[in-house]
């Protein structure tokens, strides 16, 4: 989710009646070394929502490798916990970097990785509209209204 204690976090936690631990902050990318099996509890649900930051700094093959390693690590630590991989939200600058692989390719890449790891996939681009006014910076980070919308839509998707 966008940030710790964001409106999206709060909406999601309330809708699912769960405590929420968010490790997707500060430009984080798929990074298996950050997984910590010594949390002191077993999660009821794990969501993985990386990809947009990876796209901005990694070639396709590195992104796929890192996603696979991260999901391998999640499955090794918590093999029985339901796992949901969430594709990236719309970003307003996705067409401004022709040297990168197409941003739209992320959804199917991550869907395939999710399938290989017995995880459900939720398309992030279907949870958040391409509306710059819902972003605090007009292209990447949802504002309060955008976070509220994302939290509600993600909660509904996870309940299905």
Across the structure, where does each feature detected by a protein language model lie?
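Serine-esterase "nucleophile elbow" of acetyl-processing enzymes
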Residues: 1-29, 33-38, 42
């Amino acid at each position: 989710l966008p940030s710790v204690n964001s409106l999206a976090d709060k909406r999601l936690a309330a809708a699912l009646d769960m405590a929420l631990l968010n490790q997707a902050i500060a430009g984080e990318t798929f990074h298996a070394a950050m997984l910590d099996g010594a949390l002191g509890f077993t999660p009821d649900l794990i969501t993985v929502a990386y990809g947009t930051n990876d796209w901005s700094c990694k070639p396709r093959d590195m992104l796929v490798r890192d996603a696979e390693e991260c999901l391998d690590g999640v499955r090794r630590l918590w093999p029985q916990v339901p796992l949901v991989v969430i594709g990236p939200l719309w970003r307003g600058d996705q067409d401004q970097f022709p040297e990168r692989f197409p941003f739209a390719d992320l959804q199917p890449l991550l869907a395939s990785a999710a399938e290989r790891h017995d995880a459900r996939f939720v398309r992030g681009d279907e949870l958040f509209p391409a509306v710059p006014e819902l972003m605090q910076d007009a292209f990447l980070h949802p504002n309060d209204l955008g976070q509220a919308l994302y939290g509600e839509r993600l909660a509904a998707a996870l309940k299905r």
